[in-house]
């Protein structure tokens, strides 16, 4: 059976038998891979924590009939432990890998791989707030999938902006002529934040107030849900937690 190597980030795992796991990974060259890691649940496993979610590893696999088999794994990026120490970061990371799992397949996508690894690295280092990092990742990953939003010109007719009404079903901001009845009007600061998250304008993003961040997150969640057809479970948990903290504050 052919043997191959690749870099991969672990998206999720689930138990198989007494000691094995099926590991779902997004790889640099082979797209999404599902493979068996034999004996990984044993205390003395040679894989250790290298095949846990959010970890990036150099893996060697051989092709099986239905599932490939991991034979070696060496750590490239150990992000899991640092992310797990913070609940908001952990929830954000779960939403990221869930989105990546939904949006990728066996076709190689280097940009998808690099975007996810970069976002997990940023979370583990605490470079930006978890919510900002997640929202930026979701907007970018959806753009790579072909659903790039517009936060400047009208997403329907292209009329130059800025515009203040947002319709997620139409792809972002819309001009007065294209806005359907009842379209929500959004603060200019929120539009600016969404644009910054999409383009990596972190200075603008970090300067946004909590209410602006909350409004932007709600729109990003709605946009992701519209295009993914059903909501991300982890994103729903994060939104619920935000509402609870806002109510208690």
UniProtKB/Swiss-Prot annotation:
GO terms for cellular component: bacterial nucleoid. Coiled coil: none annotated. Keywords: DNA damage, DNA recombination, DNA repair. It comes from Leifsonia xyli subsp. xyli (strain CTCB07). The gene is recO. The keyword DNA repair applies. GO terms for biological process: DNA recombination; double-strand break repair. InterPro entries: ARFGAP/RecO, DNA_rep/recomb_RecO_N, NA-bd_OB-fold, RecO, RecO_C. Involved in DNA repair and RecF pathway recombination. This is DNA repair protein RecO. Belongs to the RecO family. The keyword DNA damage applies.
